[in-house]
Amino acid sequence: MQLLLRDPEYTDRLAAFLRSVGQRPLVREPGQIEVDAPDEELDAYLRVWIVLHPEAHVELQA
């Protein structure tokens, strides 16, 4: 699953958050992260991330 961030400055923060919940994110480039996780699990993590960082827009791409 690809995660695209509107503001690439959040890339490292989101990657660190995903690592903190046991994921292994791969930063492809600023603003783009790849994560191999079940959709439901990733959706739950991103809901928490959005609460913590409401100004950061994240888009999912399959």
What is each model feature region?
Residues 4-23:
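Short amphipathic alpha-helix segments
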Residues 4-6, 35-38:
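Short hydrophobic/aromatic beta-strand micro-patches
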Residues 20, 36-62:
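C-terminal basic regulatory modules in eukaryotic proteins
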